[in-house]
Regions:
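A glycine/proline-hinged amphipathic helix-loop "lid/cap" segment
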Residues: 1-67, 210, 296-305
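Alpha/beta-hydrolase superfamily serine-hydrolase fold, recognizing
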Residues: 7, 56-57, 61-66, 70-305
Length: 305
């Protein structure tokens, strides 16, 4: 794959900056070292909070959460990190910006991580928080990477809930076939490789993943009805890219409303580049516009229906 052509100069600068903080071989280190290095990288890319935005920490359904005050419906944001790394500090500037730009309350859940807590611990935590929030009013779901997986699984767990206004999945891993499509075409993509995906999948389950568990791999479900309006975003240069389109297509085929967008030339983890890479900034604008529309019960204008 000719990434020199597909990926533009600002994105390459982001890739190099990421590699300086989180080298490609980090996945081969101990989990403790992976977390230490990841936390350092997150601090390096942290953009702070927009003016007037504050957050408070507490527990929801027994799960530690960070809450950014705002209007309802609230957004439950589930962070990425391969189910291994990340937490309340890793994505809170992203959550702060979402809150500032949409005016909505945003809640980030500090779900349990592997390998200490294999699947379904993270799913159980995310579903418990979502149910508690939904009991208080309408809700939106959003998440990137592993968090996109959790958001889709939680949507299934809440299937048909009238207060679930929509979900936005950002470069999610949804259990698509790693031996076909983007899994092969972008097996050696910058930022995330096919081997990385397989490593994190096995670690999540303390061994090979189950063959038919939609709480772990939402694309393994046999029923895609009753799911909320959905935006699923794939990064073109990412082995997970095809999962977004496959998921949106199945919702649409089941009579739901969903759209998939492939962001050209972007790589896994590009949300951290939203201030430095124009393509990433445009994608973040799309995310904000979609959350705003879903919150109002609308479909995003200018997007395919």
């Amino acid at each position: 794959m000719d990434y020199q052509t597909l990926i533009d100069a600002p994105t390459w600068a982001f890739i190099r900056a990421s590699a300086a903080e989180y080298p490609d071989d980090t996945v081969s280190l101990t989990v403790a070292d992976q977390r230490r290095i990841y936390d350092t990288m997150c601090r390096a890319f942290h953009r702070g909070y927009p003016p007037g935005i504050t957050a408070s920490d507490g527990a929801i359904a027994g799960v530690r959460c960070r809450v950014f005050d705002g209007a309802r419906p609230a957004v439950l944001y589930l962070h990425g990190g391969g189910f291994v790394v990340g937490g309340l500090d890793s994505h809170d500037d992203i959550c702060a910006e979402i809150s500032a730009r949409t005016g909505l309350a945003v809640i980030c859940a500090d779900y349990r991580l592997v390998p200490e807590h294999p699947h379904p611990a993270a799913y159980d935590d995310a579903l418990a928080v979502a149910r508690a929030l939904l009991a208080d009013g309408p809700l939106l779901l959003a998440g990137d990477s592993a968090g996109g997986n959790l958001a889709a699984a939680v949507s299934r767990g809440l299937r048909g809930a009238s207060g679930l206004r929509g979900q936005v999945l950002i470069y999610p891993g949804l259990g698509g076939d790693p031996d076909s499509g983007s899994g092969l075409t972008h097996a050696h993509a910058p930022m995330l490789t096919r081997e990385d995906v397989l490593f994190y999948t096995d670690l999540r389950h303390a061994g090979p993943p189950p063959a038919d568990d939609p709480t772990s791999a939402p694309l393994q479900d046999h029923d895609f009805s009753g799911l909320p309006p959905t935006l699923a975003i794939g990064a073109e240069c990412d082995p997970l890219c095809d999962d977004a389109a496959a998921y949106a297509a199945r919702i649409t085929a089941a009579g739901g409303r969903a759209m998939a967008v492939v962001e050209p030339g972007l790589v896994h983890g590009y949300l951290r580049a939203r201030a430095t890479v124009p393509r990433a900034a445009a994608s973040f604008d799309r995310i904000i516009a979609t959350l705003t529309a879903f919150a109002a019960g609308d479909w995003p204008s200018g997007d395919p229906q």
